[in-house]
Amino acid sequence: MATGVYQLPNLLALLPKKPGGDISPHFKEADTGYNAWVHKKLGWFFAKEVYNAEMPLLAAMAWPLASCQELRAILAYMTSSFMLEELTDRCSSTKVVNNSQLWISTLRDTEGGETSRHPFIKTMRKELIPMMKAAVDPFHWPQFIASNELFAKNVIREAFVRDADMNENAANNIQSYTVMRRETIGTRPCFVLMRSTRRLYIPDDVLAHPLMTEMEDVAIDMVSIANDIYSFKKEYGDNGALTNLLTVIHKDPTTDHLDLQERIRYATKLFNAALDRFHSCRQKLPSFGDVALDRHVSSYADGLIDWVVGNIEWSLVNHRYNTFVHEKDRQNNIMRLNNRPFSSQHFVLFIVLSILFGRLPVQSLYRMFYA
């Protein structure tokens, strides 16, 4: 294969069809309503980022059984999560702590953000959280909040790791990266929303069963691996894909000899292993002593498949990643990569701002180019 041209895996061929169907029939209605809201309520710069993310398409593909109201609630949460990323992505760990705590306290109780003047928090409190509460089943709301509390804590942890420059402990080892990514990708709250849309009333003690937790963990692993494969081209152009599984594989001492094509194959093997573990866990699930509950557990496993497949479908067609140059490349899973890392204007701007605001130590910059 030519230089700079890479064969990506056909991950969809490895997976069963979505039990919930291809896409929510309410996609167009939710998409139109959400984009009108974004245009009216959000500032131009942030609105552009939101449009580019194509969140309505992801919501409709990953939650195919969701009603229009539920899709709007899911989009409200996605927007809130996007806001958390903006509040924590380019600031000190101290600021991350403050902003994450403000974000979760607002989500937990809208009065928690009442004194904040930040436009994101105001929008969450007045617009987004009411949408969520109107659609999320009361049974699932406590689980939803608990999953977001864990998510916010891990966003803080990730910031401290980044500030302490502990990459050798957090991002240079495949296993450590996988464990950390499970809690920072933000998928667990989405799974709670999925249980709500499907009316799956699974109590906490059943969710805590070892086979249930492993099944959920490996589903998240599949989402994470797929995201890192399909977003690699974008991240490579933005910042050299500093925090991406394909980069971590290159840094891990056991796999640092692999070139990029071999790393893609290795990531595919990790995906296959996660899928095998998912099926194994599902087959071994015991009865929980109630026919209706057992049916809900089985439907939850179906929902996890919907989510994994829907996320991949979205990754293949969205304009945020732009993984493929044209339709023929998409059909053949061909990625064309500019072999000059760190050449994009986005990355140059990232470096300049990082140095100016003290967010990138000189030693990290040296390693970035010469390690």
Where do the model's predicted regions map?
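Alpha-helical, largely C-terminal catalytic domains
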Residues: 1-371
